[in-house]
Amino acid sequence: MARFTLPRDIYHGKGCLEELKNLKGTKAVLVVGGGSMKRQGFLDKAINYLKEGGMEVQLIEGVEPDPSVETVMKGAKVMQEFQPDWIVAMGGGSPIDAAKAMWAFYEYPNTKFEDLITPFGFPELRQKAKFAAIPSTSGTATEVTAFSVITDYNTGIKYPLADFNITPDVAIVDPELVEGLPVKQVAYTGMDALTHAIEAYVSTLHCPYTDPLALQAIEMVLAYLPASYNKNMAAREQMHYAQCLAGMAFSNALLGIVHSMAHKTGAAFSTGHIPHGCANAIYLPYVIRYNAKNPAAAERYAEIARRMGLEGICQQALINSLCEKIDEFNVRLNIPKTLKDFGIQEVEFKEKVAKIAELAVGDACTGSNPRAIDPANMEKLLTCTYYGTEVDF
C-alpha cells in the first residue's frame, strides 16, 4: 500500500503571511535563522500576526545553515519550558528542518537523536503542538515535506530524518519573502528544486499522484529560474510555487543518489562546506548518466526531455539534451561543473572518497534510486564528479 501525504492547508500568494493570525492556540514558538527575516521586517510581522490571533510568542533565533544536533536540543529545551501548542518555523530550509526535529524532542524529551534516524520510525506527534512552516527560499520545500536534515558536526555527516509525522500542518508560501534573496541563493535553491522534481519523477516510488507535480515543477523551473536569478520578481513568485510543487512530489515519491551524495559530502571536506543546492547541481547530470543505464529510468529521463521540448531523435539523444540543459543552467548560474572546480583539494578527496561512498550508499535516499549502486560504483561516480570524467559504467 502506498501513501500520499501533504499539509492540511497550503496558503499561497503575496501577503498570505497574514494567515498566521488565524491559527487557533494560546502559545507559539517562532523559530528563525540568521537574521534576514528580522532585517526585512517579516519577523516583526509574523510576531504581530500571532499576537493578533491571541497567542503568546517565544522566539528561537539564530539557527545556523545546516543545523546541528546541538541547536536542535537547545531549541527543544526552550519548547519544553514554554509549552507551546503551535511551532511556527520561518526562513530557509535550516530553521524549518531544525524546528521539525525540535518538535519531536519537545513532545518526547527522553528520545535520543539516534532513535530518529530510522526512516519513518518517529513516534506520533501532535500530542502537544501543531506545526506551521513559512519558507523564505525557493528550493528545499521543507514546508510541505516529511523530511528534515540535521548535521552531526562531530562526524561531518548530514542525517536526513524522514517521517510523515513531521509533515507540517500548515504551509504559508508567500512570495514576498523571497524578493530579497541573494542571487547565489536563488541559483542554489533553484537547482535544488529541479533536482527534487527530477529525482521524484524517476524514483522507484513515483506514482500517478506525484508524476504531474514533478513534471509541472520541472517545467516551471526551466521557464523561470534564469529570470529569477536576474531579479525578475514575477519569476521569483513562480519559482516559489515551483519548488513547493517539487516538494509535494518528492515527499511522497522520495529521492535518489544525487541527494545521497550531497548529504554525505556537504560537510566532509576541510576546504569548506558545499551548499546543498550547489552539490545537487554538480552531481545531477552525472547521476542521470549513471541511472540512464537502467531502461526504465532512461525512458523517464527521455520523457522529461520530451515534455520540456528538448531536441533528440532517439532516447539517448533526449537524455543527452537533458544533461546538456542542466550543464547550461549551471554555467548561467555560475555553479562549478566539478568538485575540483569547487575547490576541494585532490589529496583530501582521494583520502576520503571511499568512506564517503560507503556512507552515501547507506543514505536514506539511496533506496528509491532507480538503479542500484554499491560502494565501488559510488566511489567511481564521485570520482567522475571530481574530475569531470565520463560516466561509462
Explain the meaning of each model-derived region.
Residues 204-213, 227-238, 253-258, 274-277, ...:
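Flexible, glycine/charged-enriched surface loops at secondary-structure junctions
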Residues 268-271, 277-351, 391-392:
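Gly/Pro-rich interdomain helix-loop hinge
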Residues 139, 244-280, 363-368:
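Glycine-rich phosphate/pyrophosphate-binding beta-alpha loops
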Residues 147-253, 376:
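Carboxylate- and glycine-rich phosphate/diphosphate-binding segment that chelates Mg2+/Mn2+
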Residues 70-176:
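Glycine/threonine-rich beta-strand-loop-alpha-helix active-site module
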Residues 348-393:
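Short, amphipathic C-terminal "tail helix"
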Residues 1-86, 339-340:
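ATP/NTP phosphate-donor binding region
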